[in-house]
Structure formats: C-alpha cells, structure tokens
C-alpha cells in the first residue's frame, strides 16, 4: 500500500499548487499500485483545501477510485504506537496525521507518498528505521 500524505493530495486537487505538476507525474507512475488515504490525512487535507470546489475535486477523485480511505492503525490495534511516536518526537511538534502515517508504514510492504521533507530527514519508525517513501524527496 502507498499511503498518500496531505501535501500530495492538496497538490493533486489544486492545480495552482507549486507541486501540482509533480503530483500528477508521480500519480501516473503509480498506475496499477494501491493508493490509500488515512482518515487523519483526509481530515487534514479537507482543512487545507480552502474552497468547496477543491474539496469536491478530492471527493470525486476518491469516489472514482483514485485511492481508498482506510484505517490501518486501528486495524492493527496500534493506536498506542501513535501516542508513543508523538511523545518521542514532541520537540519537533509533529501533527497527528504524520504520526499516523509513520505507524501505518510499520508494515514492510507499505510506503508514504509525500512532499514533506520531515519524513526523509527527521521522522523515523519507533524502532529507528527510516520511513519508506514512495518517491525520493527533492
């Protein structure tokens, strides 16, 4: 599973976003791969998209099968890991959606699709392993 971050979702919905072209190009590279959106990321994205029109683009993309909305942390009963991760990185003031994504990718077959450099340079798994990214960050 490739878990999409809000930075990517905003860029996919808002063509005026500086990263919109890169998001579309990367989406094309993911054809045939399963993309997921977590509820915390969906909530964060909803608030970042400033107009109803942009939110409608997101909803239609999800309804059209662009990604599935899932709750992987709850499915693995790993919410406690999210709290531990937030405590571990509290000096960096991470948001809940980022913590949730990191814990969601504890499974070896998953990665995060993001433009947020903290996933490459700051955030780590609870065991200290690097967070797996769907694409290298520029």
Name the predicted role of every residue range.
Residues 71-117:
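Active-site neighborhoods of divalent-metal-dependent phosphate/nucleic-acid chemistry enzymes
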Residues 9, 42, 119-120:
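A generic structural signal for short hydrophobic patches within well-formed alpha-helices
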Residues 5, 45, 105-106:
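Hydrophobic residues within well-ordered alpha-helices
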Residues 1-37, 49-62, 138:
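Short, well-structured N-terminal submotif of metal-dependent ribonuclease cores
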Residues 31-35, 67-69, 107-111:
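Short active-site oxyanion
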Residues 1, 71, 108-138:
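Acidic, PIN/NYN-like endoribonuclease modules and their adjacent C-terminal/linker elements
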Residues 6, 39, 95-99:
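Conserved glycosyltransferase catalytic-site signature
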Residues 10, 46-74, 78-84:
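Active-site-proximal, substrate-binding regions of enzyme catalytic domains
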């Amino acid at each position: 599973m490739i878990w999409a971050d809000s930075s990517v979702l905003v860029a996919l919905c808002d063509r005026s976003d500086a990263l919109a072209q890169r998001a579309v190009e990367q989406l094309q590279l993911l054809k045939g791969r399963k993309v997921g959106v977590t509820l915390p990321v969906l909530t964060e994205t909803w608030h970042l998209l400033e107009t109803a029109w942009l939110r409608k683009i997101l909803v239609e993309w999800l309804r059209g099968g662009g990604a599935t909305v899932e709750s992987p942390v709850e499915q693995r009963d790993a919410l406690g890991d999210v709290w531990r991760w937030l405590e571990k990185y509290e000096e960096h003031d991470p948001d809940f959606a980022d913590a949730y994504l990191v814990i969601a990718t504890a499974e070896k077959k998953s990665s995060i699709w993001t433009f947020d450099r903290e996933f490459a340079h700051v955030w780590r798994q609870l065991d200290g392993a690097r967070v797996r990214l769907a694409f290298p960050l520029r």
